[in-house]
Amino acid sequence: MSDAHGVARDQLRAFVERIERLEEEKKTIADDIKDVYGEAKGMGFDTKILKKVIALRKKDEQERMEEDLILDTYLHALGMIENPPEG
């Protein structure tokens, strides 16, 4: 095997091993997050709502306002809310 193939093989192996380590770290973090949700649930918090709060905190105010307006538009169209959205 030529030296170039050996280098490519070593690089490929290094990438695969790095990805495998990161995947394991990701699993560990996901397990930790699950544990925190379990703690919150044990303290009486609604984890479904907690997840929504976390998702909302990831968005900026403008994005949240746009989504709320669209949601209200859909709900109004379906007769689920009375007042049409103000936008």
Swiss-Prot record:
It holds the Pfam family GapR_DNA-bd. InterPro entries: GapR-like, GapR-like_DNA-bd. GO terms for molecular function: DNA binding. HAMAP family: UPF0335. Belongs to the UPF0335 family. This is UPF0335 protein Avi_3695.
